Amino acid sequence: MSDPSEQGIPAPEGPANLIDTDYEVGQDNVEMSVGPFGLDIHNPVFAISGLTIIAFVFVTLAFQESAGAAFGDLRDWLTGTFDWFFLTAANIFVLLCLFLIVSPYGKVRIGGKDATPDYSYTGWFAMLFAAGMGIGLMFYGVSEPISHFSSSVAEGAGSADSWAPLGGAAGNNAEARDLGMAATIFHWGLHPWAIYAIVALALALFSYNKGLPLTMRSVFYPIFGERVW
């Protein structure tokens, strides 16, 4: 296994259980030049995702009306059929965060046993809001409940789009107001923070403690082994 620090991955401070792999960051990449621009791309990932995006854009532009109707129907079906899944999954993330806080796993130190924080709690909170959700909270904290409310009461007798978070409150202003606030709190309260925290924790653990590349695929290494690369 090559030295993680040589690949731009911070070496753990103190004892850490590194994962032994011969993979080196960028070993499967293809380097090329397009005019004055140099490209360094991961061949399988770039080819599959690039072709998928091109095909999607082409079909959408070629059949705009049909695509618009199809995407609208798909959105309505997904949000109407799997609303329970969205709510349940977000609640599971919150419960998982609470479990990690009170369980022995919460004592695992990111960066190794002897690692020390680079920033104070005040600095971390400032970065979380300034670079994370700050502008979203300032803007959508006001506009989102208004948008939800308007989508329920704007049309004639109060019919709402079926995908709106408060579609069932059509024609009832008081209920639309309450559900609009509830949907906004769900989108910007503890639930999104819990989702971000679990994903960030997984990335940090496998990179800073296990010595793997800072990518989502590293999280699946215990399951798929070398096939994740």
Kindly label every feature range from the protein language model.
Residues 17, 37-47, 52-61, 94-97, ...:
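Helix-loop-helix module between adjacent transmembrane segments
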Residues 165-170, 176, 190-193, 203:
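Alpha-helical transmembrane segments and their immediate juxtamembrane interface regions
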